[in-house]
Amino acid sequence: MAYNHRISQQFHSSQQHGRGSRKKEDENDALMRLPDKEIAGCINDIGIPFTAADLIKPNPQQVQMVLEWFAELLMNTTRETVEPAMRAAADDICGDFPDIVPTDTRNLMGFFVNMRRLMAECGVNDFTFTDLTKPTHDRLVKIFSYLINFVRFRESQTAVIDEHFNKTEKTKQRIETLYTENQEMEQRLEEMRRVLKANEAEVKEKVRRNDELKSRLRELGRTQEKVAETLERVKAEKARQQNLLKEKMERTVRTRQEVEKLRPYVMESPASLQSSLTELSESLLREKNQIDAMEKRARALQTSSDTFTVVSNDVQACIKLLEDIAVELQKEEDEESRASRNKEAISERGNNVREVEQTEKLLQRQLARWNERIEALRNTAHEKAQVAQKRMEELREVQIKLREERTEKQRDMERRRIRIEQTEKKMADLKESIETEIQSAHDEYLKLESHIKLYITEMEKSL
């Protein structure tokens, strides 16, 4: 196999560049590295039995246990905490074949991802899965040294870390409190809306009844006015009838007096009058001197008779008028009793109306107070809802930023993983090419050696 000089030069140049960067890393590692006994003592201090011999000949399970303790201390992450997420990922990827990836391996891979992030924060940027499964002494010294130094630095900055952690916890508690208050305010707002709807129906019913009572009151007022007018007319008619009755009674008394005066004349019979007339006519001759007086008396009697007839007719008319007046008086008394009952009913209705008006005013004041309270609560709830909404928007923005950062980190991790795989592939190809060159160089060396031996043999023969 021929020797490739170009590949050899490229390999040497890459080796020189790698040696330069490795030299800087070695200087940093030299500053950060701790003695084996100090590392073992620190691990023993955390409660895990560990010796320098365990560091020289590492056990993967023991190393994983120590790293898991550091991860739990610094990130609150263990294989148990990543198990649900890894199980869900396995269910999504493997589907009906969950046994393709064993549970321990799956959890260890999830733990490795978190551990690699921690190691990157500690300064170990070349942490690989092999450091968990096949650790070496040099790698463990570097990893544990960086971890212990990071823990020491963290302990020296405990006050600042606790301050930021307390701020974070307070922020979380404040968010939870605001969310709870927002939920409570929403429930109270819904309850107030339901109460407002119920009160609106009741108030509408009260207003409707109030309007009905007002219309009824107006009708009663108009009826009262009509009854008052009728009562005034009846009173005027009563006064007129009383005056008329008084006049009729006075006329009746005068008529009765005149009748009493004329009664002696009326009680005499016609026969006696005829006899008297005969006697008068017989004595006419004897009493010629009394003829004029008798004629006057006869005319007076005729006048009295006509007057009696007229008075009798007037008495009959007065009796009939008295009967009509009695009927009218009875009607008037009935009207007065009805008017008094209507007046009492009107006064009672007026009292009811006043009570209704007072109740309405009270309900209006209560409604106004409730409306003010509801408006104040609504404004307060609206302000708190706006504040909560703004806070939720801020939290959403923070969440979006965190998601973007997480996505970017995942993409970066994926790019790094691809880059690492490509680098490993290049290294494998380069290793293969180097081995091929070494093999070809070895073959060339063997050929040259055989040629030289042959040449020496020939030279010896020729000598």
From Swiss-Prot:
Q: What is this protein called?
A: Probable kinetochore protein nuf2
Q: Which GO terms describe its molecular function?
A: microtubule binding; protein-containing complex binding
What Gene3D superfamilies does the record point to? Ncd80 complex, Nuf2 subunit (1.10.418.60)
Q: Which organism is it from?
A: Emericella nidulans (strain FGSC A4 / ATCC 38163 / CBS 112.46 / NRRL 194 / M139) (Aspergillus nidulans)
* Lineage: superkingdom: Eukaryota
Q: Biased-composition ranges for Basic and acidic residues? A: 337-354
- Spans annotated as Disordered: 1-27, 331-354
Q: Does the keyword Cell division apply?
A: yes
InterPro entries in the record: Kinetochore_Nuf2_N, Nuf2_DHR10-like, Nuf2_N_sf
Oligomeric state and interaction partners are given as: Component of the NDC80 complex, which consists of ndc80, nuf2, spc24 and spc25.
Q: What does this protein do?
A: Acts as a component of the essential kinetochore-associated NDC80 complex, which is required for chromosome segregation and spindle checkpoint activity.
Q: Which family, according to UniProt?
A: Belongs to the NUF2 family.
Naming one, the record's GO cellular component terms include: Ndc80 complex
Q: Where is the composition biased (Polar residues)?
A: 1-18
Q: Which residues form a coiled coil?
A: 166-455
